[in-house]
């Protein structure tokens, strides 16, 4: 099996916690060939979507962790699976990449997650499709509506629609301190749409990342507990990860969403759940594989590659494409 990973620069990888690295390591352990490219290398030429793909061999060393082979210009149809693992922001370059990947799909490439499904599921807005699991929420750039929402709820989280890692998230309490400044800053004076949600006190127990793989939930979540004085549990914002079994409510949410999202072409999804409420549906490059595995022994990457084998094999009727 030949797998192409579309990734950020390898120099940015922190392999002790990187989920893409965990995928690569599991694939390599099964004898699969690993190739990488960057988003900027995707090209449509002569109506064929191709990229400069670099073969990668993992060394097992913590620092000098890979050896690169000679880069080759190859069509995406030459791989058994193409994994889009580029981190947000989900900007127009990201959208353009999904268009190119969708063309490659029509040419026979097998791309995960499905490019159209990535576009169709804004990581913040997708929760609106599952309203029975969400806290009170408003999405607008109208300052008056945002102020009214705050007056109704009393304690509100404001966040941009295109952020990641907890960037740009603000809490405004019942006293309304800095409400105007937060609204002006996040909406860029009314020119950008934002989300506001009722503050959920259960954030003190962690923002739970629940992974859905191939239509099934991983049995353990990673509760990302905020550091003192913070409302953001994101690991990138200083939160601490604590693996735990899915609660009864977690399972209800996960089992309701997993088959629906898988049917839409989303092989890997990261749900964010605070207390009893779904807050985000992450579809670009969900993470937390290694933290869950290290704390529980459950092989998340193994479950993912198992699902990838089934998905790629089902799409092709068998594995083993030959590169030109």
UniProtKB/Swiss-Prot annotation:
Record's cofactor remark: Binds 1 Mg(2+) or Mn(2+) ion per subunit.
An annotated Gene Ontology molecular function: metal ion binding
Keywords: ATP-binding, Glutathione biosynthesis, Ligase, Magnesium, Manganese, Metal-binding, Nucleotide-binding
Species of provenance: Ralstonia nicotianae (strain ATCC BAA-1114 / GMI1000) (Ralstonia solanacearum)
Name the UniProt record assigns to this protein: Glutathione synthetase
InterPro entries tied to this protein: ATP-grasp, ATP_grasp_subdomain_1, Glut_synth_pro, GSHS_ATP-bd, GSHS_N, PreATP-grasp_dom_sf
Enzyme Commission code: 6.3.2.3
Transmembrane as UniProt keyword: no
Cofactors demanded by this protein: Mg(2+); Mn(2+)
Membrane-spanning residues: none
Cellular component terms (Gene Ontology): cytoplasm
